[in-house]
Structures are given as structure tokens and as C-alpha cells.
Amino acid sequence: MVADNIDAGVAIAVADQSSSPVGDKVELPAGNYILVGVDIDTTGRRLMDEIVQLAAYTPTDHFEQYIMPYMNLNPAARQRHQVRVISIGFYRMLKSMQTYKIIKSKSEIAALKDFLNWLEQLKTKAGPSSDGIVLIYHEERKFIPYMILESLKKYGLLERFTASVKSFANSINLAKASIGDANIKNYSLRKLSKILSTTKEEDAACSASTSGSGSGLGSGSSMVSDSVSISPRDSTVTNGDDKQSSKNAVQGKRELFDGNASVRAKLAFDVALQLSNSDGKPEPKSSEALENMFNAIRPFAKLVVSDVLELDIQIENLERQNSFRPVFLNYFKTTLYHRVRAVKFRIVLAENGFDLNTLSAIWAEKNIEGLDIALQSIGRLKSKDKAELLELLDSYFDPKKTTVKPVVKGNSNNNNNYRRRNRRGGRQSVKDARPSSSPSASTEFGAGGDKSRSVSSLPDSTTKTPSPNKPRMHRKRNSRQSLGATPNGLKVAAEISSSGVSELNNSAPPAVTISPVVAQPSPTPVAITASN
């Protein structure tokens, strides 16, 4: 699917880089191994993404743990796994988009240590005769082993992991070899489980019909007596059981969500078990069924050491691939089609050992002829793709030329729809230009609503609605200085007094006259004579 290969609009999927084995294939030696189904949920399909859920399954035990990632899930991963990251205050946590509940999670190193403890316990329970564990996964393009090994290398837990786990095995190769139907294009777990369930039902129906035809003549009376002995009370109980079973079936369908890693781990184990025991009904706990399963999947199992070497090569290819980002910058700014083509070109160049510095040296020595010779050695590209890539690289390295931009083809239907929408939008804008006095029209712009309309077209607090075509004149407030300084101050005051708004202020209070204070003469000093 494109959603799985495109990560946030730019596809840099590690799973798309190379699904072919690198180097000589190291087969798993014969021995007594424990088969475990494994799967993961991640924040994306890149090697730099993180694991969100790690799950493993055996018929006797299972492991499941959610991991709190540092980055958020991209839209494709959120849609597939139905899990998203939320922030409450200073805390980040996982929340299910199905149940709307908070999911208990751990850090990546704590979850990996728990997973290693669980694997070591499985090996200990099997006894000293056990040679190790084989992890079975199911996917079209190899991605799960790379993510698990990269996480283990990050925390220095790879040696402890290789002490218990000896090999990874992809069950999709077993499905292609067992079914071999050219009409089946998608070997997903959901598709294979449906195919295997239908074949099992057909086999059960055939066996029931043959047994019924052989024993129906001799036991017909007993069958009739059994059918007659059923009472109405028993039938009501049966109906209740049917209702309960249907309810449980609906609940089971809700729980069997293939976007969950624990469900896919169990499906991977069950599908491999049924494919390897197609002759009879497989019993998961029987040693014979598990032995048949190991013998069937052993040709497709590889040692962990070879997967580690492949991971190192994938990291080198990823570095080469990222070096071409400036060349395809215009491709990533256009449509999804050109982004996918840019990813394809980058992957092919990186897998053939080219990086930006290597091609730059070739162009500096032999110009476009050297680039043409280098691209001719790539057999995966068509002649049209080689011509497009050659023109793009030459325009990038040549300073006299401008970098080629991809041509986006226009669609006539889209143009017609665009004109139709514009025509409708013009009519609607004319209708919207009419003033509306309804309260709903004035409240739809509140609380950060539609801000496309200008503020001048909104009605003010006055009773008179301004005309949309005539701008509203704002009257300046007259201060005391402007009233005394300008000669129009008396005129404005006269206009205001003549209006009916200020009729109550026409009668002024009588003026109060204050008489000036007359200074009283100061008294003259009187001489007092003393008498005997």
C-alpha cells in the first residue's frame, strides 16, 4: 500500500530498499528449536522510527508490551494501529483510538529487557536440549528484523539477544511456496487466514457428508429419537446460547484487529502452522505439528548474524540515499507521483553503490557522457527513467543550467470543477455582501471563527447598519485644545446644541457673581499712658 510506503508525504521506507538477500545465505542447522511468532507496531516505515508495540506468541505463552516513543506516529501509522500520542501537561502517553483509553506503556529499554527475560524463560522451560528460538514474522518486505536488531544495538543488548534467538524466518515465503497460486497477488495475513479457513470448512463439510452417508442408514432411528427428545425449554436455552455466542463472536471480531501487533503475531504463527500441516488438522501443542512446522520453514530461516550484516548494508544504503536529497528537492515539492519516483531513483542509485559525491566526480571528469555510462550499468531502470534521471543529474551538476523541475500534467475535469467552484463562489460572495441583521449572522464570527471577512463589513454597536459599499466615517473626538484652537469649535458646538440628542443640556445654570474682596485698613496702634 502507498500509505505504508509513504511516510508523512515523503517516502523513505527502509522496507522498500532491498528485500533480496545480501551475500551468501546462511541456513539454520537442524536441531530442537522453539518457534515463536513475533510482530511490532512502529511510528513509521523508516529505520529512524521507533517501536510502539512489541508482541510475541507461542501456544503456551505470549508477550505483549507497549512502548512510549519519543516521536509521534505518522498519519499512516495512526490509521493502521489506531493509536496516537497525546500530551497532558508535561506528560506524554499513548491513547487508543478505538476505546479512547490511556494505554499503559514502558520505555524502550525496559520493554526490550522484559522481552529478553521472556525469551530466556522460554528457553529455560524447554530444558537443556533446546538449541534456541526461531522468531517467525510475516511481511512482504523485510522490516521487522531490522527494527528489532537496531533497537537492541542502540542499548547494547544484541549479544544477550543472540544467546537465545538463533534465527528469523519469514512465513510469507512459506505461503508462496505452499499455495503457489498465480491469482493471489497479496499474501497478507488476513487474506491467507480467509483462504485457509475456507479450505478447512470445505474439508470438514466433505468429511461430514461422507461419514453421514455411511452411518445414516444404521442410526436413523437414533437420530430421530434425539431430535424428538428436545423440549421447548431446551430450545429456548439453545436460542440464548446462540445469542451469547453471536455476541461473543462480535466481541472477538473487535478484538481481532489486525492493526495490533499481538494479533498479527498470533496470526503469523497460526498461518505457518496450518500451511505446514495441510494434510491433517494441526494441534498447536503437539510435537509432531511443531516438527512439521520447523521442517517446512527451515529453508526460509536465516541466522541472526546474516541479518545483522544486512542491517549494516541497509544503513550504508540509507546514507547514500539521503545524500541525493538536494537533487530531488523539486520532486518532493510536487505531487505524490513524483515523490514516489524520487524515492525509487534514490533507492536504485544507493543500492548500486552511487552517492552524490561519486556522481559529481564522474560528471567533473567526463560530463554527461560519464553519467550516461554509469547509469547504463543499472538494469532495474527503464530507458525512459534513465533518460529522465540523466537529464536531472546533468542539470544539477552543470552550473550553467537550472535544475529540472517535474512537469505536473493538468486535468481538464479538475479545471472544469475549479471554474464551476469559482462561479459558485462568486455568486455566493455577492449574496454574502448583503447585510444581515439576524443574530446568527453576527455570532458565527466569534470565538476565532471565519476571519476571511474584513472587520469593516461587520455591524457596529449602533442601531443603524452601515452600507457595505459606503465606508463608515469615523468622527474624531474633540479635545479641549482643539476646540479652543480651531475656529470651527463654536460651529460644532452649535450643531450639537441644535440636534435633538442634546436637548436636555440646553439650559445652563445661572452664573454666580463673586464680588471682589475689599481689603480692610489695618488698625492703628493706640498709645496707653500710665497714670499714678
UniProtKB/Swiss-Prot annotation:
Domain of life the protein comes from: Eukaryota
This protein's GO CC annotations: cytoplasm; cytoplasmic ribonucleoprotein granule; P-body; precatalytic spliceosome
Example of a GO MF term: single-stranded RNA binding
Compositional bias (Low complexity): 220-231, 404-417
Any single Pfam family the record assigns to this protein: Exu_RNase_H_like
Location relative to the cell: Cytoplasm, Cytoplasmic ribonucleoprotein granule
Alphabetic keyword roster: Cytoplasm, Developmental protein, Phosphoprotein, RNA-binding
Keyword Transmembrane helix: no
Modification Phosphoserine occurs at: S467
GO annotation, biological process: anterior/posterior axis specification, embryo; bicoid mRNA localization; embryonic development via the syncytial blastoderm; mRNA splicing, via spliceosome; ovarian nurse cell to oocyte transport; pole plasm oskar mRNA localization; regulation of pole plasm oskar mRNA localization; spermatogenesis
InterPro entries given in the database record: Exu, Exu_RNase_H-like, RNaseH_sf, SAM_Exu
Region (Disordered): 206-251, 403-491
Biased composition (Polar residues): 454-467
PANTHER family: MATERNAL PROTEIN EXUPERANTIA
Role: Ensures the proper localization of the mRNA of the bicoid gene to the anterior regions of the oocyte thus playing a fundamental role in the establishment of the polarity of the oocyte. May bind the bcd mRNA.
Subunit details: Component of the osk RNP complex, which is composed of at least exuperantia (exu), ypsilon schachtel (yps), aret (bruno), cup, and the mRNA of osk. In the sponge body, forms a ribonucleoprotein complex (RNP) containing at least me31B, exu, yps and the mRNA of osk; interactions with exu and yps are RNA dependent.
Protein name: Maternal protein exuperantia
Gene: exu
